[in-house]
Amino acid sequence: LESNDLLLNSSQKICAQTNDLTPPCPPVNFKISDQYSCDYYFFDKSCDEKDFENRIEWSSVDEECFLDTKFFNIYFSDNGYNNFDNIATTSNNYFVHKNLTNLKGAYFITALDRSGNESIPSDTIRRDNCPKYLLPNVFTPNGDGKNDFFTPFYTDGSITNFNYGNCPRFVRSVNISIVDRTGKQVFSHDSEEDTLNGIYINWDGKNSSGKELPSDTYYYIATVTFDVLNLDESVKEIKGWVQILR
């Protein structure tokens, strides 16, 4: 080497990233998927369905925030109001919450950037169960094995063209009193006491003494308790009539 040549030592050079402490934008347009609305979701679900799922969707605010976002944290509360748990982390803009015993609960999400900074929470959305309990207005207790009992709309899958949207859903208990035209009680049922028939009643058209009642119109008042978050919707009084045809 010539005496005036220089040697450059790069051994002390340090490569570093800027310490990013700025959290990303929170996700927006957070909602339950339209395909998971009560009517749509239960359109083809059997009356005995016990395995449920929710799908939630969202988007970022703008392109800059989207590029700064790497993951999303999903938080869930089964009581719908507090005690939220982080149940998943995903890079998608949707999440399917599977293996649920019911639909009710609440969700919020946060965004995570590449440095691990977490955004403020999104809006919280609540998902409630889809309560349903419908009673027919006629039954024929003649022992032919068809429509012999007064029971809510239900099928084990053997009825063709059955509307599964009418299945009893998320019912805790049923208490019903049935009277004749004079107002005399001819039958009563409490699902919490008669656990064999439960919410299905299965009235055979006989009075409380076991005597067959004549073909006629009878009137009922039923108090139905549902498994829902909304307490205003948890207890419903259903009044109606049913005709016995023999």
Residue ranges, per PLM feature:
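Conserved aromatic anchor
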Residues: 42-67
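Beta-sandwich strand segments
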Residues: 4-11, 117-122, 228-237
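Beta-strand-rich modules
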Residues: 1-9, 96-118
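Short loop/turn motifs at secondary-structure boundaries
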Residues: 25, 47, 51, 126-246
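Recognizes extended acidic, P/S/T-rich segments that occur
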Residues: 68-102, 194-196
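Short, solvent-exposed loop/edge segments of extracellular or virion-exposed proteins
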Residues: 29-41, 138-141
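Proline-centered linker/hinge motifs at extracellular inter-domain junctions
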Residues: 22-28
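Extracellular Ig-like/FN3 beta-sandwich strand-entry sites
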Residues: 69, 102-106, 171, 215-217
